[in-house]
């Protein structure tokens, strides 16, 4: 049985080995965080990787697709570009396409978005009284994607017990593989 074998392995470990395994797990977690921060610096985006959570961008992107983002300040936003934006009062960013751009005489640019699979533009999603998005609302712009790889993230959000199981299995893997 897996659980009994695992417990026997843990019991056979001396304190030094157990301490080493805990440190090893800590190194894995801290390495992942450093890689994330590095990606943030390189891409200029607060969230360089996002998962598509709905079918609003089909057929371009499907639920569970993993998007790679950049957010260079100097690059102008263009019609047809896919952006990830955050709306005040909503925790989760939205992935949609730029539908229209509105440029004022002073050079200030605002834009309107829409999901490819939606019948109407996103004005109904914006906060009340807001009709356009601004560059400050953009988290990033889609530069590439990997299909369906983010479905694990969706499962972890939809089923919290699944996320605990994944974390437990990762911890178990680190403890059992001592090399």
From Swiss-Prot:
GO cellular component: a single term: signal peptidase complex
Annotated active site: 56 (charge relay system), 96 (charge relay system), 122 (charge relay system)
Lumenal face of the membrane: 37-179
Membrane-crossing segments per the record: 17-36
InterPro entries, per the entry: LexA/Signal_pep-like_sf, Pept_S26A_signal_pept_1_CS, Pept_S26A_signal_pept_1_Ser-AS, Peptidase_S24_S26A/B/C, Peptidase_S26, Peptidase_S26B
Catalytic reaction(s) noted: Cleavage of hydrophobic, N-terminal signal or leader sequences from secreted and periplasmic proteins
Family under the similarity heading: Belongs to the peptidase S26B family.
Stretches of the chain found on the membrane's Cytoplasmic side: 1-16
GO molecular function: peptidase activity; serine-type endopeptidase activity
Membrane-related topology note: Single-pass type II membrane protein
Region described as C-terminal short (CTS) helix: 165-176
Cell compartment(s), UniProt: Endoplasmic reticulum membrane
Highest taxon of source: Eukaryota
Quaternary structure annotation from Swiss-Prot or TrEMBL: Component of the signal peptidase complex paralog A (SPC-A) composed of a catalytic subunit SEC11A and three accessory subunits SPCS1, SPCS2 and SPCS3. Within the complex, interacts with SPCS2 and SPCS3. The complex induces a local thinning of the ER membrane which is used to measure the length of the signal peptide (SP) h-region of protein substrates. This ensures the selectivity of the complex towards h-regions shorter than 18-20 amino acids.
Keyword Transmembrane carried by entry: yes
Function: Catalytic component of the signal peptidase complex (SPC) which catalyzes the cleavage of N-terminal signal sequences from nascent proteins as they are translocated into the lumen of the endoplasmic reticulum. Specifically cleaves N-terminal signal peptides that contain a hydrophobic alpha-helix (h-region) shorter than 18-20 amino acids.
GO biological process, one term: signal peptide processing
Domain comment as written in the entry: The C-terminal short (CTS) helix is essential for catalytic activity. It may be accommodated as a transmembrane helix in the thinned membrane environment of the complex, similarly to the signal peptide in the complex substrates.
CDD domains listed in its UniProt record: S26_SPase_I
Protein name: Signal peptidase complex catalytic subunit SEC11A
UniProt source species: Rattus norvegicus (Rat)
Matching PROSITE patterns: SPASE_I_1, SPASE_I_3
Top class in the EC scheme: hydrolase
């Amino acid at each position: 049985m897996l659980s009994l074998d695992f417990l026997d392995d843990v019991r056979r470990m001396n304190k030094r080995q157990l301490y080493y395994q805990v440190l090893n797990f800590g190194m894995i977690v801290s390495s992942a965080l450093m890689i994330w921060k590095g990606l943030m610096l390189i891409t200029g985006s607060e969230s360089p990787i996002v998962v598509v959570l709905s079918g609003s961008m089909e057929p371009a992107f499907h639920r569970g697709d993993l998007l790679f983002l950049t957010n260079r300040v100097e690059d102008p936003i263009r019609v047809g570009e896919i952006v990830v934006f955050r709306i005040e009062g909503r925790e989760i960013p939205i992935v949609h396409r730029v539908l229209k751009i509105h440029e004022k005489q002073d050079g200030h640019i605002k834009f309107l978005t829409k999901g490819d699979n939606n019948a109407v533009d996103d004005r109904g999603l914006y906060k009340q009284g807001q009709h356009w998005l601004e560059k400050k609302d953009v988290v990033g712009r889609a530069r590439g994607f990997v299909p369906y790889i983010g479905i694990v993230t969706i499962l972890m959000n939809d089923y919290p017990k699944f996320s605990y199981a994944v974390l437990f299995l990762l911890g178990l893997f680190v403890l059992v593989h001592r090399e």
